[in-house]
Amino acid sequence: MRSLSLAWLLGGITLLAASVSCSRTENLAPGRNNSKGRSLIGRLETQPPITGKGVPVEPGFSIDEFSASILTGKLTTVFLPVVYIIVFVIGLPSNGMALWIFLFRTKKKHPAVIYMANLALADLLSVIWFPLKISYHLHGNNWVYGEALCKVLIGFFYGNMYCSILFMTCLSVQRYWVIVNPMGHPRKKANIAVGVSLAIWLLIFLVTIPLYVMKQTIYIPALNITTCHDVLPEEVLVGDMFNYFLSLAIGVFLFPALLTASAYVLMIKTLRSSAMDEHSEKKRQRAIRLIITVLAMYFICFAPSNLLLVVHYFLIKTQRQSHVYALYLVALCLSTLNSCIDPFVYYFVSKDFRDHARNALLCRSVRTVNRMQISLSSNKFSRKSGSYSSSSTSVKTSY
């Protein structure tokens, strides 16, 4: 029960993590109730409900000029959708193909394959909802798809980021363990990988539960738009959210990042201390490329968003206003690039993935690949037999 409570606590963190920006609106009257957005500050309008065509319309929120400028500016209506379009166009087919390879083309389910399959699944579950997010930003941050789809979009959006961090950490530790202990029992390792993967999915589900429970869409009459996860009433901000987000940044980002970096440093030391034949040198170079790719993902995708998240809520806590939210939006947008980088990680980690990806791009069926492998093996055996026969003949003639 204690662990469940902690998971719910972390969930409360995630739920206040995103938001948008850009447009203008009216100044707030002093008699109105304060309401604070997850990132933008607004106020609940208390006048009687407006009616349109005889149908009551629920009171909306008014926001300050800074928040309005973000919600209507080019940052959220041009830059963000362009990046999301790029991520969708690259991430959907690449992760779809990766998941297909891991599930249907890879026979041996090693721990690395299990972690990479889960990572590809997390990316795919996030990317498939991007058309809704792209449409939302292109239409001036106006959400027209209902409350339920907004909750699903936000839940999968944040769940993907933390899933990627945790599965990338597992993959890094597993790669180091393979180098240090190459003779370990593969079936036992695979069972452990399955258990760890299930635990990660359960943790992410618990963490994102509040995103599905709380109201995510807010109507802003001054702009005539309905925002999705961009404005939230102040009364829902229960407790010190800065501490929650700080805990999430330390527990789900900083600690896994340090663990990943440590695993790669030890991996390089181990490879350097081993005998450097041609095969070991290729393995070391591939490991270095993998390290560079993963570190680039952390520094570009995860570090800025988690750092600015903490700074943003610290400013809201201490100054009741945050002017770094536009930067946080950019960082959060860049965090989605991990869905494009992950397939390159699979390429560097797994030779089987490289072979299967090449065969898939060349439209070779499994049967065709098997025939080619049998033919190649037969040719190698024939050459070895011919070499043995010629050496035997030369021995006989010498006598």
UniProtKB/Swiss-Prot annotation:
Positions glycosylated per UniProt: 33, 224
The keyword Transferase belongs to this UniProt entry's keyword annotation: no
InterPro entries for the chain: GPCR_Rhodpsn (IPR000276), GPCR_Rhodpsn_7TM (IPR017452), Pro_rcpt_2 (IPR002281), Protea_act_rcpt (IPR003912)
Topological domain spans for side Extracellular: 39-73, 140-151, 214-237, 320-325
Propeptide position ranges: 26-38
GO cellular component, as recorded: early endosome; plasma membrane; pseudopodium
Keywords: Cell membrane, Disulfide bond, G-protein coupled receptor, Glycoprotein, Immunity, Inflammatory response, Innate immunity, Lipoprotein, Membrane, Palmitate, Phosphoprotein, Receptor, Signal, Transducer, Transmembrane, Transmembrane helix, Ubl conjugation
TM spans (from-to): 74-103, 111-139, 152-179, 186-213, 238-271, 280-319, 326-349
Disulfide bonds: 150-228
Disruption phenotype: Delayed onset of inflammation. Reduced progression of osteoarthritis, infectious colitis, allergic dermatitis and experimental autoimmune encephalomyelitis. Upon induced allergic and toxic contact dermatitis ear swelling responses, plasma extravasation and leuocyte adherence are significantly attenuated. Upon ovalbumin (OA) sensitization and following challenge infiltration of eosinophils and increase of eotaxin content in bronchoalveolar lavage fluid are abrogated.
Its membrane topology: Multi-pass membrane protein
UniProt superkingdom: Eukaryota
Cytoplasmic compartment residues: 104-110, 180-185, 272-279, 350-399
Residues marked Cleavage (site): 38-39
The keyword Cell membrane appears for this protein: yes
Maturation and modification: A proteolytic cleavage generates a new N-terminus that functions as a tethered ligand. Activating serine proteases include trypsin, mast cell tryptase, coagulation factors VII and Xa, myeloblastin/PRTN3 and membrane-type serine protease 1/ST14. Proposed subsequent cleavage by serine proteases is leading to receptor deactivation and include neutrophil elastase and cathepsin G. At least in part, implicated proteases are also shown to activate the receptor; the glycosylation status of the receptor is thought to contribute to the difference.
Listed GO MF terms: G protein-coupled receptor activity; G-protein alpha-subunit binding; G-protein beta-subunit binding; heterotrimeric G-protein binding; protease binding; proteinase-activated receptor activity; thrombin-activated receptor activity
A biological process term (GO) from this entry: positive regulation of actin filament depolymerization
Job of this protein: Receptor for trypsin and trypsin-like enzymes coupled to G proteins. Its function is mediated through the activation of several signaling pathways including phospholipase C (PLC), intracellular calcium, mitogen-activated protein kinase (MAPK), I-kappaB kinase/NF-kappaB and Rho. Can also be transactivated by cleaved F2r/Par1. Involved in modulation of inflammatory responses and regulation of innate and adaptive immunity, and acts as a sensor for proteolytic enzymes generated during infection. Generally is promoting inflammation.
Additional observations: Synthetic PAR agonist peptides (APs) that mimic the first six amino acids of the newly formed N-terminus activate the native, uncleaved receptor nonenzymatically by binding directly to the corresponding second extracellular loop to mediate signaling.
Protein family per UniProt: Belongs to the G-protein coupled receptor 1 family.
Subunit composition and interactions: Interacts with TLR4, COPS5 and TMED2. Interacts with GNAQ, GNA11, GNA12, GNA13 and GNA14.
Record-given protein name: Proteinase-activated receptor 2
Biological source species: Mus musculus (Mouse)
Lineage, broadest ranks: Eukaryota, Metazoa, Chordata, Craniata, Vertebrata
